[in-house]
UniProtKB/Swiss-Prot annotation:
This is Uncharacterized low temperature-induced protein all0459 homolog. It comes from Anabaena variabilis. Residues 95-104 have a biased composition (Polar residues). It comes from the Bacteria. Residues 67-119 are annotated as: Disordered.
């Protein structure tokens, strides 16, 4: 018990600094997410057209009779899937557009080679 009281008496002079640091940390951790709000402001009508077209196609499929295998394959081959078509096809990652990207394993290996000095 004496060790505990000795440790507390040693911390007494820096207690104010610990409390101030903790308060500053709490304040900064709550304000940083607020800065993210102003980083990117999208237009209210951005992507609405694509969404409406996708919703229209979805409604048509829901009202019609179930498609046969050949029709599903034909529509699926036109784009990403039978409903979405080619909407945002350039934004999505797939094997055709990610051949030049580096893998996580390769990135880590390059980093370790730089750190250790091995080439």
């Amino acid at each position: 018990m004496k060790i505990f009281s000795v440790a507390l008496s040693m911390l007494r002079p820096v207690r104010f600094l610990i409390v101030a640091f903790t308060c500053a940390l709490l304040f900064l951790s709550s304000t940083v997410p607020a800065f993210a709000i102003s980083s990117y402001q999208s237009e209210p009508t951005e992507a609405t057209d694509q969404l409406l077209e996708t919703q229209k196609a979805t409604d048509e499929v829901a009202r019609s009779a179930p498609l046969g295998l050949k029709e599903v394959q034909k529509k699926s081959n036109e784009g990403l899937n039978e409903v979405q078509g080619v909407a945002d096809i350039n934004k999505q990652k797939r094997p055709a557009n990610s051949q030049d990207s580096s893998s996580v394993e390769g990135d880590i290996q390059n980093f370790l080679e730089k750190v250790t000095g091995k080439n």
